[in-house]
Amino acid sequence: MMKRWMMGLCIALLSFSQIAQAELELVITEGIDSARPIGIIPFTWEGEGKLPTDISSVIASDLQRSGKFSPIATSKMPQTPDSEEQIDYRAWTAMGVDALVTGKVTKNAEGNYVVNYQLVDVVRGQLTSGESRGLANGELVLTKDHLLVNNRAIVKETRLRQYAHRISDVVYEALTGEQGAFLTRIAYVVIDDKSKHPYQLRVADYDGFNERLVLKSRQPLMSPAWSPDGSKLAYVSFENQQAQIYIMDIYKGTRELVTSYPRHNGSPRFSPDGKKLALVLSKTGSLQIYIKDLKTKKLTQITSGRANNTEAFWDPDGKSLIFTSDRGGQPQIYRVNLADNSTKRLTWQGSQNLGGQLTPDGRYLVMVNRSDTGFNIAKQDLKTGAVQILTKTFLDESPSIAPNGGMVIYSSVNNKSNELSLVSIDGRFKARLPTTNGRVRAPSWGPFL
């Protein structure tokens, strides 16, 4: 199933401005019942009115969406302490909760917010009654081994939600040993048939908040891809009656034309160091993979022959590419070594496999797999060859992996409209990101901020 490319003409370039339409909002569909219980205590606000951002709610939502944690509802909490000294450890362990996040927010004289928060090991706190004894310089002293995190920060009002995501990352890493991906962004294309500019390239926080309109066009926009530093997006637009590849600086609002060869220009993908761009051209006939050096402008052809080769994705070490090819009759995923152009087929299970991406550690291949059940997101262990179908949604496409490798965002069809969905890399947790003002396609998960 190769991508179908449509013709376009006019494009309008916008500043990186916020849009007023309904934002994406995650809806949990599966996976929470088996997750680890955790207490995210409502942060105490020692100020007038309401806190502009409900920090504890953001943290709870982040951890819930990871699929690994199940925050306790506030109504079921035995208490709501704002520091570890106030915790009733027995009450929490009786609920099966082994970790708590507590916090307090105040406002300083400059009008900024002072956020104090703690991550507490409840089990260890119960065993030591909140205090343990250890040796320091040969003397017995009280320690706080149960206090896993104890941080303080001064935050501007406009940064409160961002800092809440940062807290989520800290908590997630402390409890799992893996880096969190909550302070990240996604890019995607929205198709709003009721708009004068129906094709829109947007960027948002991973959870759909702080959505920004980057670009709008009367003609199709496709295949957004992030630069490694998160400052640029490569994408395909249809100007001058053909597909063209551009790179846009999302902060400056400037863009550069990268390729405009006859016929097809598509599937741009930055190299891990950001110095090159893998792309697909058909200037010699069939679709072929090329690499363009963004500094020297040198173009190197990687694949050749009569078959169509497309959807290139870089190996994390930058030494090879995976790509989709129909050289065997149906689309399957291959790997090409850039040193000698040797090629190996990777996928064998399913009549078709396409849209492949690699997890950051290079261990797993995530792709669209076609079987008797349709087109679904699947994961293949590149060491063992084992394949796991991750989704049960309809007509899945365009998977994109979180920078920590823990989640996959993709496009699917629900109620006859394209929308974005999330699935954990183990397939146990699923969520949907519905939108009310258009079809959402071609998601791309950005790098760590």
UniProtKB/Swiss-Prot annotation:
Residues 1-22 form the signal peptide. One of its GO terms (biological process) is cell division. One of its GO terms (cellular component) is periplasmic space. Its main location: periplasm. Keywords: Cell cycle, Cell division, Periplasm, Signal. Pfam families: PD40, TolB_N. Transmembrane segments: none annotated. It is found in: Periplasm. The Tol-Pal system is composed of five core proteins: the inner membrane proteins TolA, TolQ and TolR, the periplasmic protein TolB and the outer membrane protein Pal. They form a network linking the inner and outer membranes and the peptidoglycan layer. Belongs to the TolB family. Part of the Tol-Pal system, which plays a role in outer membrane invagination during cell division and is important for maintaining outer membrane integrity. This is Tol-Pal system protein TolB. The lineage of its organism: Bacteria, Pseudomonadati, Pseudomonadota, Gammaproteobacteria, Vibrionales.
